[in-house]
Amino acid sequence: MLARSSQTLLAPTPAYSPAIPAADWATAAATPSLTKSGALQAEEIATYLASAPGRAILVDNTSDISLARQYPTFLKKGISVVTPNKKGFSDDLSLWKDIFASAAEGKALVYHESTVGAGLPVLSTLKDLVATGDEVTRIEGVFSGTLSFLFNTFAPASGSSDAQWSAVVAQAKELGYTEPDPRDDLNGMDVARKLTILARIAGLEVTSPDSFPIESLIPAELASLPSSADGITQFMTRLPEFDAQMANVKDTAEQQGKVVRYVGSIDVAAKAVKVGLQYFDKDSAIAGLKGSDNIISFYTKRYGANPL
């Protein structure tokens, strides 16, 4: 199957035979019996994939919530899903339940390890802890490489930095650490989505990522600027007006012998999830991160005071 917004090219079904050679796609695209006008709907794609001679896998490399909401459609037909798209697993709790119920119904698999921690085995480790009977009491960490870079540069644990907050944000944007619109990092929602996924695996029924406190680093006066190229330029131009606010946060931490970091935490016993700024001793693991490194700690009954 080869698709674009105006046309979809399909190999014959149900046997997918004869297959269309890759080099002949242009010729095949001119054959009415092999094409369909416009893009296929999720149900049509699922039906097509389900007719494959072997097991089919949907690999979703988008961050599209509308596609993620269609995962149950594929899973019920026995089509496994592999994706880094965290939106489907951090959206409304009903979708989370529907995804895994549909996977069980269709005897399909769901792999979303890279929704948290990129390539690190974060979710599989947490699932193994839960599956082997350990009791997770708390999860804490720095979950955003972008925000890690910002605070490690702005308020390093060793040495000092005179850099203004807006200059560090501009540097991160220039280096490609931030999204095209840095507000997509500074609003904390990406971290909140990751915390939602972890909390659900740990056993908490978090309804959605906006159901718990999220501390945004976007000045209120700039939050309503449009997401257009002009709006992004306005945001970056005006951000220096608010450098004093972040300098005060850094100075307050320094007066206590600490540094400020942007972290997420889950208190399983208290059923509390939060995302925002916290102060840490300079010799702590979180304070000692370098560059854009992340750190995630699992506190469990089995591991006691020493987190995994």
State where each predicted segment sits.
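Short acidic, glycine/serine/threonine-rich loops at helix termini
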Residues: A11-S17, Y71, L93-W96, P121-K127, ...
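Rossmann-like NAD(P)H-binding beta-loop-alpha module
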Residues: E105-K107, Y111-L175, D185-V191, I197
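Substrate-binding/catalytic subdomain of NAD(P)-dependent oxidoreductase enzymes
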Residues: A163, A167-G288, I295
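Hydrophobic beta-strand scaffold residues
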Residues: V81-V82, L109-V110, E179
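Rossmann-fold NAD(P)-binding glycine/threonine-rich loop
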Residues: D64-K77, K86-S114, A118-L129
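C-terminal catalytic subdomain
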Residues: Y303-L308
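N-terminal glycine-/serine-/threonine-rich beta1-alpha1-beta2 phosphate-ribose binding loop
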Residues: M1-K77
